[in-house]
Amino acid sequence: MMFTKLIWMGFFCHLCRGYFDGPLYPEMSNGTLHHYFVPDGDYEENDDPEKCQLLFRVSDRRRCSQGEGGQASSLLSLTLREEFTVLGRQVEDAGRVLEGISKSISYDLDGEESYGKYLRRESHQIGDAYSNSDKSLTELESKFKQGQEQDSRQESRLNEDFLGMLVHTRSLLKETLGISVGLRDKYELLAHTIRSHGTRLGRLKSDYLEGGGQKMG
């Protein structure tokens, strides 16, 4: 009987010491539904909670506690109601974040219902801009061709005018040469006439002088 009591006392001492060398079971946390991973296999009250992996908890009983001063211990000291309150606040914060994201998305969508419609509208706008630019380029090319044709026509007209001026100048030069030849002939005729008139005047003078001398003698 005493031997049986000693066995039970040793078993309870073994449980109080918290030594665990088997697989991981929920029963190692005395039914609090905590799941802890103890690296050295020796579960004690002063185990570092950062070295224990907490999977889930529905009780405020602590097994891996470092004290009341640490942040992890303060988090583990929360009751289920407090945890629900914290979770509610986190959900509200997440809701506000999602609301901000949705507003930013709505700003990005510019009034459209989805990114697909927004992208389709943007693609249509890009297509319209491309078609307008292509149309403008076509008009510019046609105007450039028209300008080239006008320049070529103007150049040909200038060439024709220049050739006409050359022909007219040549005809004027030919006419001037003809006039100069005629003037030269007239000048020679006039010089011959003047010489003949001089000869006649000289003869008349000599005849007059001879006639006057005879009368006086």
Swiss-Prot record:
PANTHER family: FIN BUD INITIATION FACTOR FIBIN, FIN BUD INITIATION FACTOR HOMOLOG
Family: Belongs to the FIBIN family.
Transmembrane intervals: none
Organism of this sequence: Rattus norvegicus (Rat)
Residues bearing attached sugar chains per UniProt: N30
Keyword field contains Transmembrane: no
GO cellular component: endoplasmic reticulum; extracellular region; Golgi apparatus
Keywords: Disulfide bond, Endoplasmic reticulum, Glycoprotein, Golgi apparatus, Secreted, Signal
Protein name: Fin bud initiation factor homolog
Subunit organization: Homodimer; disulfide-linked. Seems to also exist as monomers.
Signal peptide boundaries: 1-18
Subcellular location: Secreted; Golgi apparatus; Endoplasmic reticulum
GO molecular function annotation: protein homodimerization activity
Family annotation (Pfam families): Fibin
Keyword Iron in annotation: no
